Amino acid sequence: MYKVVVQLSSNDILVQKATISQLNNILNAFESIEVEVVMNGLGIDLILTESLYHHTLERLHEKGIQFLVCKNTLNHRNLGNTSILPFASIVPSAIAHFIIRQHEGWSYIKAGF
């Protein structure tokens, strides 16, 4: 099975749209794939409770995509766990998560253009 971890660190609306498109393309290209989207820095804006893409992200989650948020970023921005959409999970450190996943053989993609 293929495994990919995607980093989103931008809150640019065009990058967010491109990321959603890329996620759909990944799902359409592979019958069996594990996908994690890890958001850190300004990228967490996509998964905040007031996100314009709430329903789109929820549908992607229902198709198996995991959305992970950096706890360090939440702390830095003084946001609590309830600030993110309920289907998202929290990782202690996005950077550490990327290192772990790459060590485990996961592919890494920087979201956007």
What are these regions (language model features)?
Residues 7-17, 45-48:
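Short, glycine-rich nucleotide/cofactor-binding loops
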Residues 11-12, 43, 73-76:
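Solvent-exposed loop/turn segments at secondary-structure junctions
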Residues 35-40, 67-71:
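Short internal beta-strands
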